[in-house]
């Protein structure tokens, strides 16, 4: 019963307070994701005869570019939350309170995975060109770690009491404190745990990608780039439907919680990425077909 209670109600965003420094769950989960991702990607790189140390080399720039991209994407579409009187926020450093621009306070939440993917992709392209590595193969190596990191990172939303869905009375409903509820749902206590839905969906994708990766050498169907396309299709499919439940969408031409008169940005991007994945697989299969005909001819 205690486990169930802890599951449906966040214990708070703070993992440990050491006085001079506060360790938050969000930061801890990101750190764990990076370490696990480093281990997984090195294993996959070795399986593709690519120097595993390349993973360690790209890691710093990949983290920085992904965080910058994820934060910038979110701030651009939610600038109203960081402008005017909200431009500065308080930050405690060695028992001293200082004022910093609120858009720099990443630890308070407010990042978007699609922006992180854009930032990370820029870093990967530059790295592959400088090292003369096959881009599609290298991305295929990194993708399973990325989706696993997304699965783990979603629990940061749980501890921050954010990114939840519309009200519900389902047995797995999530309690949200009144100060974290949208004004439209201020009188509701329980909401869809959309963080959990996406975390489990992403974990399932990770398993499928690893199975596919291990079969890539055995079947000609799975050419370099197939893992990346499969990720785009599967993640975008799940994100599209889960996004429809959320009360904090980034909107184009509308305002949360329903983007009335506009469109949810994440759903728009999901449609684009889903289509890109399908087109990518089509061209991969086309290249395989043409290659076989040339050999037979």
UniProtKB/Swiss-Prot annotation:
Q: In which pathway does it act?
A: Protein modification; lipoprotein biosynthesis (diacylglyceryl transfer)
Q: Where in the cell is it found?
A: Cell inner membrane
UniProtKB keywords: Cell inner membrane, Cell membrane, Membrane, Transferase, Transmembrane, Transmembrane helix
Binding residues annotated for a 1,2-diacyl-sn-glycero-3-phospho-(1'-sn-glycerol), in chain numbering:
154
Broad class of enzyme this protein falls into:
transferase
EC number per UniProt: 2.5.1.145
* GO biological-process terms attached to the record: lipoprotein biosynthetic process
Q: Has the keyword Coiled coil been applied to this entry?
A: no
How this chain sits in the membrane, per its record, is: Multi-pass membrane protein
Q: Under the GO molecular function aspect, what terms does this record hold?
A: phosphatidylglycerol-prolipoprotein diacylglyceryl transferase activity
Q: Which domain of life is it from?
A: Bacteria
The UniProt entry lists the main location of this chain as: membrane
Question: Membrane-crossing residues?
Answer: 20-40, 57-77, 105-125, 133-153, 193-213, 225-245, 266-286
Q: Which Pfam families match?
A: LGT
GO cellular component, alphabetical, reads: plasma membrane
Q: Which family, according to UniProt? A: Belongs to the Lgt family.
Q: What does this protein do?
A: Catalyzes the transfer of the diacylglyceryl group from phosphatidylglycerol to the sulfhydryl group of the N-terminal cysteine of a prolipoprotein, the first step in the formation of mature lipoproteins.
Q: Which HAMAP family match?
A: Lgt
Its recorded name reads Phosphatidylglycerol--prolipoprotein diacylglyceryl transferase
Native species: Prochlorococcus marinus (strain AS9601)
Report the gene name.
lgt
